[in-house]
Structures are given as C-alpha cells and as structure tokens.
C-alpha cells in the first residue's frame, strides 16, 4: 500500500516537472522579433559600464527590413540581422572609418567584437541583452526613450 502511495506521489511530481519544463521552454522561445524594434543605447560591455566622450553608442533595429543602423562609439555602422526564436546574428556589416577619442575607439572595438560574437538575444523590460552561443552576456542596452 505504501509503495502505491509513493508511486502516485512520484507520478505527480514527474508530471509537475514536465509541465514546468514545457512552460519554461515555451516562454524562452516566445520572444517576437518586434521586441527588438527601435533604438537601443549601449550601457555595458562584458559587465563594464560604458560612457562615451563624443557620441552615444547605440544600435537601432528595423525589424521590417531586417536591418540595423547605429554608432559603435565613433563610427556609424549599417548592416543586417537574422532573428529566430531568440537567436540573433548580425551580417553584411559596413561602417565609416573615422578616428575619435581613445576611450570611444576602445568602446567601438569592443562593440565590433560583441556584434561578431552575438548569437542570442533577450529583452527584459527596457533592457536588451546580447549574448554569445553559450548564453554569456556580452553587452546590455537600454531602450531609448526618444
């Protein structure tokens, strides 16, 4: 009799675990590309706060055309992106080639690396997280209020 009770409890717990896992998987895949739309200001790179001297670093997503535009610190950048279920890849990138303050050039070099390594994206409220293939945070951006 006790064995039957234990087995029933185990079945309930197993069902509960399956439901939780399913809900977790569905919610992680539910991000819509439209959440990326608009201008995002770069706030941190590899958990280090970003402060530019001359121009604010930003990325602007045009989700209808699959294009991005932005400033990585000094230079303007244009390119395309693909998005599928939280996976994000930048491509066909082109940028101007100006020099600027050393601090801004360092931010720009870091952002070029971030864009190259980005494989996943997550939006949490007004914060966008760019992540590598393992889910490690590369950069965080805040939605512009303009």
Task: Write out the residue ranges for each language-model feature.
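Lipid interaction determinants
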Residues: 27-146
